């Protein structure tokens, strides 16, 4: 099976499959009402291929990038594997028990709030209560991990801005928190694009280090004793968890053992007959007081653009930006933000969501015509809330009504700047030995490389 946006050149001459012929013969149109010609034009080289039951915003798991080994590991990134560990804890000797930790992405909470018709706070408590009724020991919110990711991105952008020149091109800085986009950059775009990727680790990667390193030491546990599960909106996070080096902690342990989508967790909840008591989400610091659900200033993501923009405006130009105005350009998934003074544009940032916009952005970047200092890049149109692990119908299309409801819920969550977290500042000192220490670079940053397409592939269908 191929991804519907497969970019392998040899695929472009392949004939349509029977399924495609059937679609053409019965005259069915795409769900958004666009004509086939228009759809083809919009996708450009991201041509539609055979039997597209898997989407690029789910993963890039066509046979050009997923190896057999990765395929076997992906089969373990499932609810079955999660429940297997829970059942082993119930049957085996206590000395062999594993401590189960579940970390929930903030973009997953609106899904549960919408699905169960609850406020986002009540949905958080219900989810936590359910997971603990299954046998999970701790449930964390990944917002604190996003704090670190954003703060390190802010510092990196300012450094790049100062170092940028015609001889040493450091800009634009492209975000790297979206694993679908990063995998595409490494597997397809390669060396011309890799240097522009932000080296700050994604929230999932940082959370893995927090759980398997900091939290493990606080609890006097070896990292191997912890089974860490992340609940996320999209399938790409599963591939991110498998990436060697990218998601491995200082002690050599894999930061995330299993990734489950919001939809997979909801399915477990629906199939369970457990009596659930609402419980507040845990904190890494053992606080007894319940922490309110908060988010960063992103439209439907972790908010790297907004927070880096404000920080850069202040650090580079002494300008305090309160309200950010997003100006839609090509379409609703491509926005521009500028900082202007006396008619001069000082900073020009952009958000490019969805691979149609990413393709256009990359073409301009390769030609040296991309005017931006910073681009927030996400594989999913409309951002992380539209992850295929929570916002799609059974036939694989976006559930627009659900997505709109989730966007409304998410926008109502209070915004907290990462700089305001006292816990983060404490962790910089206690865990990382200072904000500019070598350990910060080692724990919170990574590197990317151009990866040759794999010849040993495996077709994946989720």
UniProtKB/Swiss-Prot annotation:
Region span, Disordered: 1-43
Q: Which domain of life is it from?
A: Eukaryota
Pfam families in the cross-refs: Fe_hyd_lg_C (PF02906), Fe_hyd_SSU (PF02256)
Q: Does the keyword Nucleus apply?
A: yes
Q: Gene3D superfamilies recorded for this chain?
A: 3.40.50.1780, Fe-only Hydrogenase (Larger Subunit), Chain L, domain 3 (3.40.950.10)
Q: Which UniProt keywords apply?
A: Nucleus, Phosphoprotein
| InterPro entries for the chain | Cytosolic_Fe-S_CAF (IPR050340), Fe_hydrogenase (IPR009016), Fe_hydrogenase_lsu_C (IPR004108), Fe_hydrogenase_ssu (IPR003149)
Which coarse location class applies to the principal site listed for this UniProt protein?
nucleus
Entry GO CC: lamin filament; nucleolus; nucleoplasm
Keyword NADP on entry: no
Give its localization: Nucleus
Tell me which residues bear Phosphoserine: 35
UniProt lists compositionally biased (Basic and acidic residues) regions at 1-19
Q: Which GO-annotated molecular functions does the record name?
A: lamin binding
Task: Enumerate the SMART domains for this protein.
Answer: Fe_hyd_SSU
The record's similarity note reads:
Belongs to the NARF family.
Provide the assembly information: Interacts with LMNA and binds to the farnesylated C-terminal domain.
Protein name as catalogued:
Nuclear prelamin A recognition factor
What species was this sequence derived from? Mus musculus
Q: Gene behind this chain?
A: Narf
